[in-house]
């Protein structure tokens, strides 16, 4: 058995259940273990003499030395049973004490399949565990099983998601005063250990975490309204004519797209623009030197540059902030995750505070960004990405802000996930439990002591990679362009084929992810079903238009 196969992951379901802490439960477990131990000793006393014994006197002997020898022998055999990945016995080490600790870490998730150990994939936990072993913080005898070390995590991050601060708890050998430096020397530069702090034996970094801070970085051009002639734009305009005074006119977006149209007409002839509009990317192989393809590619590049030059107005930014404020409080977020029903009590979550920074310009592309910080008690799968997506769509489409509160209702709504690229875990918070730690004589778990180091790390290994990947892959541009051109009445439009082929020479993860959310139904089915098939899901497009809003009312 290989080391990777033998190294068992620790899942959140491995946590002790609530019944473990009910009155009398621990006593019963202790009594049961004691009885097993006593039976093991008494069985030796109850053994009958065999045929070679000379009567009863053979039984009446002092077994204390015999027991010690047996235990010593068993101990030696247990040490010999510890083997490496190739099945060879691991040489006996000097046994050093293990201490329960909280390890404060930060990492860039690019290139990893998430936080949690998941063989054979490369994950953050896999890198950490192997570094602990190489640095001597975990003995070789315990290097094949995470559970032997009581491994737990405060927050599990998905593939590609980063963390400025996260916490894991486990038992480590920390006698060496330079153990933190040795561990960091064994880790890649994109994973850092900020501190290793002693905690009491009952500490559980996930259960004792009172809340979590997340950050999401968003380019401000994502808040521009849909491009004229796209499906979503046409639906909004048509519904406004049918039902006036429900959705406001978006003057700023109209001026933005008019300016781009003027710029495009100065770069391309009318015939070239018509040729570009009619071009469809071939499904099979094609000649990249094709003249029309090259013109289409140049057109998309011009559009991307025009978006990056956009600077958000105060009015639109305030509208976006107001949209995000609709999440503050305790609400039923069943539409903002997967596999949750309206009646599921676990769908109710408490969002403490959401803030949006002032815009800032980063990189050679001079793209303008905002930082969104979300402080919540706990979060469900994809919840933050769906929250960002809904608030952004409400801002782009000028739909009433109340639509977000209506999404907490019983109706199922298909909300696409915003790209994972901009998401990072800022830090878990231990306000309540830190008081108890200090009472036990331990230092509180506090990331503020390492804020300067963390900021430097985030800028070099997280923020810069996010900015660079957005420029190279056009992740947010692809995501919102695909949403704007998606037609629910059939699987893929000509505009979408252009997006997949021209704007991105290789389809990015953003397009693939939004496709998963939007293409959940047959072309003729106007109400897609959720993954359980229990209730129909309402398309997000219908939810945003004046027609859909009137139906809701």
Curated annotation (Swiss-Prot):
> Which molecular-function annotations from GO does this UniProt entry contain?
metal ion binding; RNA binding; snRNA pseudouridine synthase activity; tRNA pseudouridine synthase activity
Has the keyword Nucleus been applied to this entry? yes
Please give the cofactor(s) recorded in the UniProt entry for this protein: Zn(2+)
Question: Per the record, where are the segments of Basic and acidic residues compositional bias?
Answer: 33-51, 64-78
GO terms under biological process: mRNA processing; mRNA pseudouridine synthesis; tRNA pseudouridine synthesis
Protein purpose: Formation of pseudouridine at positions 27 and 28 in the anticodon stem and loop of transfer RNAs; at positions 34 and 36 of intron-containing precursor tRNA(Ile) and at position 35 in the intron-containing tRNA(Tyr). Catalyzes pseudouridylation at position 44 in U2 snRNA. Also catalyzes pseudouridylation of mRNAs.
Designated name of the protein: tRNA pseudouridine synthase 1
- Organism per entry: Kluyveromyces lactis (strain ATCC 8585 / CBS 2359 / DSM 70799 / NBRC 1267 / NRRL Y-1140 / WM37)
């Amino acid at each position: 058995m290989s080391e990777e196969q033998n190294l068992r992951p620790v899942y959140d379901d491995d946590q002790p259940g609530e019944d473990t802490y009910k009155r009398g439960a621990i006593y019963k477990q202790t009594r049961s273990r004691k009885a097993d131990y006593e039976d093991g000793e008494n069985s030796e006393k109850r053994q009958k003499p065999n045929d070679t014994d000379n009567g009863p006197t053979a039984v009446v002997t002092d077994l204390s030395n015999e027991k010690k020898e047996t235990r010593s022998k068993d101990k030696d055999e247990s040490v010999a049973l510890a083997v490496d990945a190739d099945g060879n016995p691991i040489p006996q080490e000097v046994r050093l004490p293990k201490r329960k600790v909280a390890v404060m870490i930060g990492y860039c998730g690019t290139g990893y399949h998430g936080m949690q150990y998941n063989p054979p994939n490369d994950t953050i936990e896999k890198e950490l565990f192997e570094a602990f072993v190489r640095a001597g913080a975990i003995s070789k005898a315990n290097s094949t099983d995470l559970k032997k070390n009581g491994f737990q995590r405060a927050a599990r991050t998905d593939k590609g998601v980063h963390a400025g601060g996260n916490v894991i708890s486990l038992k480590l050998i920390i006698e060496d005063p330079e153990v933190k430096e040795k561990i960091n020397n064994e880790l890649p530069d994109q994973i850092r250990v900020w501190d290793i702090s002693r905690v009491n034996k009952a500490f559980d970094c996930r259960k004792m975490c009172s809340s979590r801070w997340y950050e999401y970085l968003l380019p401000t051009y994502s808040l521009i309204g849909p491009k004229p002639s796209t499906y979503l734009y046409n639906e909004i305009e048509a519904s406004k004519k049918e039902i006036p005074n429900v959705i406001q006119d978006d003057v700023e977006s109209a001026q933005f797209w008019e300016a781009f149209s003027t710029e495009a007409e100065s770069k391309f002839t009318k015939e070239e623009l018509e040729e570009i509009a009619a071009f469809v990317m071939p499904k099979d192989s094609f000649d990249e030197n094709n003249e029309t393809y090259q013109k289409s590619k140049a057109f998309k590049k011009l559009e991307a540059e025009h978006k990056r030059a956009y600077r958000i107005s105060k009015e639109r930014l305030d509208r976006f902030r107001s949209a995000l404020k609709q999440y503050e409080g305790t609400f039923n977020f069943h539409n903002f995750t997967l596999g949750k029903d309206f009646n599921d009590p676990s769908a109710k979550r408490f969002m403490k505070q959401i803030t949006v920074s002032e815009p800032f310009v980063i990189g050679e592309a001079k793209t303008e960004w905002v930082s969104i910080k979300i402080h919540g008690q706990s979060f469900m799968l994809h919840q933050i990405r769906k929250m960002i997506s809904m608030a952004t769509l409400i801002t782009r489409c000028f739909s009433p802000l109340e639509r977000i509160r209506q999404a907490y209702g019983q109706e199922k709504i298909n909300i696409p996930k915003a790209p994972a690229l901009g998401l990072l875990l800022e830090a878990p918070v231990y306000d309540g439990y830190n008081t108890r730690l200090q009472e036990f004589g331990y230092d509180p778990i506090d990331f503020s002591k390492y804020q300067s180091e963390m900021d430097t790390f985030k800028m070099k290994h997280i923020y810069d990679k996010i900015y660079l990947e957005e420029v190279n892959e056009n992740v947010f541009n692809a995501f919102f362009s695909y949403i704007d051109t998606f037609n629910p009445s059939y699987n893929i439009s000509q505009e979408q084929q252009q997006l997949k082929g021209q704007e991105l020479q290789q389809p990015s993860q953003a397009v693939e992810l939004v496709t998963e959310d939007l293409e959940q139904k047959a072309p003729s089915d106007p109400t897609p079903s959720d993954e359980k098939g229990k209730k129909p899901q309402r398309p997000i497009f219908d939810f945003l238009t004046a027609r859909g809003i009137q139906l809701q009312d």
